[in-house]
């Protein structure tokens, strides 16, 4: 069986990295015993992808509700509200 060494993104240590359960999506979580930070390799934050802000604004202008927009895009309602609140500010 092949061994893959995983390094800590915070302190770059490779010898003190241990598995630390799974996320709600089923992805493996890791813990660094040196700096005590936890992380997962397959993490993606949907709300920060390019074009998300414009999609939220477009859906709001086309009459789609905030909760429906959140459900369709797979982000939280608070994310939708934050984007709409900040849409008046320059980006």
UniProtKB/Swiss-Prot annotation:
Keyword terms, alphabetized: DNA recombination, Transposable element, Transposition
Statement: the UniProt record of this protein carries the keyword Zinc: no
Highest taxon listed in the record's lineage: Bacteria
GO biological process, one term: DNA transposition
Matches recorded under Pfam families: HTH_Tnp_IS1 (PF12759), Zn_ribbon_InsA (PF03811)
Miscellaneous comment in the UniProt entry for this protein: IS1-D is an iso-insertion sequence of IS1.
Function noted in UniProt: Absolutely required for transposition of IS1.
Stored PANTHER family: INSERTION ELEMENT IS1 1 PROTEIN INSA-RELATED
Protein's recorded name: Insertion element iso-IS1d protein InsA
Organism expressing this protein natively: Shigella dysenteriae
């Amino acid at each position: 069986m092949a061994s893959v060494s995983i390094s800590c993104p915070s302190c770059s240590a490779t010898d003190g990295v241990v598995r630390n359960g799974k996320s709600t999506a089923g992805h493996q979580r890791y813990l660094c015993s040196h700096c005590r930070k936890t992380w997962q390799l397959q993490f993606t934050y949907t709300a920060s992808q390019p074009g998300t802000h414009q999609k939220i604004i477009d859906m709001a202008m086309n009459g789609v509700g905030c909760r429906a927009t959140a459900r369709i895009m797979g982000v939280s309602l608070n994310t939708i509200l934050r984007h709409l609140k900040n849409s008046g500010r320059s980006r």
